[in-house]
């Protein structure tokens, strides 16, 4: 593995805070609005929809008549079944996260009458801007290391999927991407090796830490005290404790940071074998190459651009680490 100076950042990116197509508070059925007010113990007098993310579920910050604020997510099982299921899973996971994990606390949940509704602690924070600054990277990576420690082993009370359960099929995306012409020309000579690295990574990335797996800037809030909060705990799996840190470093590399230098600076990543890091990149690269070429869903017209950005970031970092030719 070789390291080199940082790249220029990838310039094409999704618009911040404007990627989701969500229902507003007024568009929720009246019975759901009444449920939320009743469970919160006060009328909702103001609602601010969250424009970030790539899912179509309701997600809004609500101001109550008594001055309190809550964050509420909701999805109906008839038209948004996969998202209702993910909210149900998130409620179960939030309920058992230890206090040491900086996640908004679950206040209550409702799972009946065709709707899954979650009310959570409202965090007065902002998303870290992109491109990443070094200061924000340090805050987030510090918080991820602390969370990994607090979540090893995973807390009892939930059946946590293994890494292979959720990621075991991803190596197959390399053949699918090659068959559909989605592999960039500079990577075509390395398709077989990338497929092998991806397959090997499923075992290397297994572990006994409950990992968030979806640590993007729109799932992070930083408050006035520089406390980092991780949101959207839908897709947690048991994995290697460094997995979430690698996800953030991948985005940092795409923003022009020297991710290999950052690997060496962090206690949780500095001793990782090259095969694990390269396998991580190959695994996500094959998946993102394939998904970026799929038709855009009506739930988020920006999803494929987002996935294409991550494919380019993973391809660049993997090529640099293995001294392969990079795209011009």
Where are these regions (language model features)?
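ATP/Mg2+ or Mg2+-diphosphate-binding catalytic cores
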Residues: 20, 259-261, 267, 288-328
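Short pocket-lining segment of the protein kinase catalytic domain that shapes the ATP-binding cleft
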Residues: 118-125
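Active-site activation/catalytic loop segments of kinase-like enzymes and analogous catalytic loops
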Residues: 242-271, 281-299
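A cross-family kinase active-site recognition segment
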Residues: 2-9, 110, 115, 127-188, ...
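Active-site acidic catalytic loop and adjacent metal/ATP-binding pocket
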Residues: 51-64, 71-72, 196-243
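Juxta-kinase regulatory segment immediately upstream of eukaryotic protein kinase catalytic domains
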Residues: 2-47
């Amino acid at each position: 593995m070789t390291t080199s100076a940082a790249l220029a950042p990838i310039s094409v990116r999704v618009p911040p805070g404007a990627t989701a197509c969500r229902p507003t508070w007024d568009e929720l059925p009246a019975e759901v609005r009444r449920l939320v007010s009743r469970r919160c113990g006060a009328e909702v007098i103001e609602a601010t929809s969250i424009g970030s993310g790539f899912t179509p579920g309701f997600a809004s910050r609500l101001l109550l008549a008594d001055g309190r604020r809550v964050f509420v997510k909701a999805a109906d099982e008839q038209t948004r079944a996969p998202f209702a299921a993910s909210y149900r899973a998130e409620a179960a996971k939030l309920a058992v996260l230890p206090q040491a994990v900086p996640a908004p606390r679950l206040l209550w949940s409702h799972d009946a009458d065709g709707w899954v509704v979650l009310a959570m602690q409202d965090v007065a924070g902002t998303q870290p801007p992109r491109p990443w600054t070094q200061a924000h990277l340090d805050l987030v990576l510090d918080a991820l290391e602390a969370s990994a420690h607090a979540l090893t082993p995973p807390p009892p009370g939930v059946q946590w999927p293994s890494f292979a359960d959720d990621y075991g099929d991803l190596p197959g995306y390399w053949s699918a991407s090659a068959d559909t012409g989605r592999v960039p020309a500079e990577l075509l000579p390395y398709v077989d090796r990338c497929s092998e690295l991806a397959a090997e990574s499923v075992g290397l990335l297994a572990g006994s830490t409950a990992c968030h797996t979806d640590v993007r800037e729109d799932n992070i809030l930083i408050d006035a005290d520089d406390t980092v909060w991780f949101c959207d705990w839908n897709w947690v799996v048991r994995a290697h404790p460094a997995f979430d840190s690698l996800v953030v470093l991948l985005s940092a590399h795409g923003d022009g940071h020297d991710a290999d230098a950052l690997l060496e600076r962090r206690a949780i990543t500095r001793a990782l074998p090259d095969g694990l890091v390269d396998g991580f990149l190959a695994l996500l690269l094959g998946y993102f190459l394939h998904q970026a070429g799929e038709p855009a869903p009506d739930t988020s017209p920006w999803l494929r651009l987002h996935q294409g950005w991550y494919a380019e970031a993973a391809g660049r970092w993997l090529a640099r680490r293995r001294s392969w030719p990079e795209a011009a």
